[in-house]
Amino acid sequence: MDYLVQSVPSKSGLASPERYREDVVEEPLTERGRRSRERIVDAAAALVAERGAGGARLDQILEAAGASKSQLYHYFSDKEDLVRAVIARRVGETVHCQGPQLDKVDSLAALRRWFDWLVDQNAERDCPGCPLGALASELADCDEAARGDLTCGFDTWIGYVIEGIERMKVSGELDERADPRRLGVAVFASLQGGLLLSKTYKDPQYLRDALDATYDHFLSLRAHHPGAPKRPPG
């Protein structure tokens, strides 16, 4: 089953899916069937978050979902297929959460607000790390289909960042040295690294430090004109 739309080339050079699908091609036809499938994906997502894809056993997933083996194999061909549905779920959640925030990024001040929002969210949730980053670390070397889904999801997320940087450049806040694609990848790498360190140390300051350093680099690329924003204290 295919969980993702085909990636298409974008001006950024990254694959840029027009829309990330959480449904499968062979979607259940009945409302009851959709609810059954959702319960299985919900249970799988929770157990994968707790134990990893390798540690989440099918019998545990079925027990948590209150579903039978026949229901599982009606909707999913095997465990790998179910894990791909979990990836689709996590990417969908990320796009739903991050997209509206990133759509507002059109200036250095707006970028600072997004960075601060990320740090606040991370601290409020006790530094849980990134679910997609955790899945990528576990699956990228052993499941090619899952790796493809994860790269598609990452491209979608990075694409939002790149679009924001492009808006900043068009508005004249960033000078000609600013490369939206490279900066977008750098922002994403800082975010992922900061989330991982914050999770490991259980200290949100690591994410703040990573994003502050990234923001300082953006400030070095700002166009020099009156009123250009400065890095806020703290």
Language-model region placement:
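Amphipathic alpha-helical segments used for helix-helix packing
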Residues: 109-110, 124-145
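Amphipathic C-terminal alpha-helical segment
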Residues: 121, 167, 188-205, 217-227
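Hydrophobic alpha-helical connector segments
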Residues: 85, 98-128, 180-187
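Hydrophobic alpha-helical segments that form the core
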Residues: 2-4, 133, 178-197, 213-217
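Hydrophobic alpha-helical bundle segments that form small-molecule/ligand-binding pockets
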Residues: 142-144, 155-183, 218-231
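Helix-turn-helix
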Residues: 39, 43, 47-81, 85
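Short, basic, alpha-helical segments at the C-terminal edge of helix-turn-helix-like DNA-binding modules
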Residues: 88-94
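N-terminal intrinsically disordered/low-complexity leader segments
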Residues: 1-35, 224-234
